[in-house]
Regions:
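Structured, acidic catalytic/metal-binding patches in enzyme active sites
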Residues: 28-33, 41-248, 252
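C-terminal motif of bacterial Sec signal peptides marking the signal peptidase cleavage site
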Residues: 18-21
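Bacterial N-terminal signal peptides that target proteins for export
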Residues: 1-11
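Generic short amphipathic/hydrophobic targeting helices enriched at N-termini
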Residues: 14-15, 58
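A cross-kingdom marker for long, charged
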Residues: 250-309
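Bacterial signal peptide processing site
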Residues: 23-25
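Residue-level detector of alpha-helix boundary/anchor positions
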Residues: 15-16, 34, 49, 273
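Short, motif-level signal for alpha-helix interfacial/capping segments enriched in acidic residues
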Residues: 33-39, 259-260
Length: 309
């Protein structure tokens, strides 16, 4: 059971790490980017819709004291008949499915971190996880990006049960279950884990070392992201600082964000015509030229901000 908890935790926290690393905070506008209102909650209407659907930008992990719901969110859920996430949360509670996917955490071809790092880098990583009480012997075959996620703060599965940390996906799923709403996912857990296989393990290992070297700044970056989130700065959260950190996750922005956003659009179009649906996806996916809001508008839908400050 504890292994399954860690698996679910790793999936959630790794997606937070991806968004945090790929969408560095910056107030500098990028030429050609659509200007969007600061709002996490949006109404979606369009041809063939009998009722509006809704789009909500989440942050996958947030401190319990910082958790909030913008005005209108509960009303939007009440006016929806289905709730869709990036991943169907039923997958995250299906023990059989989780057990079958746990080997997807590991690198292919029996590769280990030791194969990817210089001796001094390997020692840095070993010492870091040893200080956390996690011998690297048990972790060195795990894909480095998952290990990078584990460096982000002092998160653990237990922090959810104590309320120290919250996940919007988990909280929204509870609401959906209480209302007996249909739930679904725009992707599968297997797909999200497989995304990391498209990033060379050498690049992942390099990012792990750099993340550990700057681990002291991790808490500050989380605080910056949380502040942006509470101010509903979706354009800022989606703005990629491409070129500022050469060799980082910015080089894989299309794999991690843009391509996934494009794949969601036809699914949202089809599902929203069937029934009014509340879509909860990472806020980093909403803004920008290749963000979900702009792509839905290009597909002929009307999106209206509902939660402006």
């Amino acid at each position: 059971m504890r292994n399954i908890q860690w698996f679910k935790f790793l999936v959630l926290s790794s997606m937070l790490f991806v968004v945090a690393s790929c969408s560095k905070s910056t107030t500098k506008a990028i030429s050609g980017e659509p200007k969007l209102e600061d709002a996490l909650l949006w109404e979606i209407t369009g041809p063939g819709f009998t009722k509006p659907s809704f789009l909500y930008g989440t942050i996958h992990l947030i401190g319990g004291n910082d958790y909030f719901l913008p005005k209108g969110t509960l009303g939007a859920i009440d006016n929806s008949e289905a709730m869709f996430f990036e991943i169907d949360m039923k997958e995250m509670t299906d023990m059989g499915a989780m057990v079958g996917l746990m080997d997807k955490l590991f690198m292919k071809d029996d590769l280990t971190l030791k194969d990817l790092l210089k001796e001094e880098e390997y020692k840095l990583v070993t010492d870091f996880f040893a200080d956390k009480g996690l011998p690297l012997f048990f972790l060195e075959r795990i894909k480095p990006l998952f290990l990078s996620a584990m460096t982000y703060g002092d998160f653990s599965p237990e922090s959810f049960s104590t309320g120290e940390m919250k996940s919007y996906e988990i909280e929204f799923n509870k609401l959906a279950e209480n209302k007996k709403m249909k739930t679904g996912g725009l992707e599968t857990v297997e797909f999200q884990i497989g995304v990391f296989d498209q990033i060379p393990y050498e690049a992942q290992a390099k990012m792990l070392v750099e993340t550990i070297q700057s681990a002291g700044a991790g808490k500050d970056e989380m605080e910056v992201m949380t502040k942006m989130y509470k101010e509903q700065k979706i354009s800022q959260m989606a703005t990629s600082a491409l070129g500022e950190d050469e060799g980082g996750l910015q080089d894989y922005e299309s794999i991690l964000l843009s391509n996934r956003n494009k794949a969601w659009i036809p699914q949202i179009l089809v599902q929203s015509k069937k029934q009014p649906t509340f879509y909860a996806v990472g806020a980093g996916h909403l803004g920008g030229k290749m963000g979900v809001i702009n792509l839905l508008r290009e597909a002929g839908l009307t999106l209206k901000p509902l939660s402006k400050l």
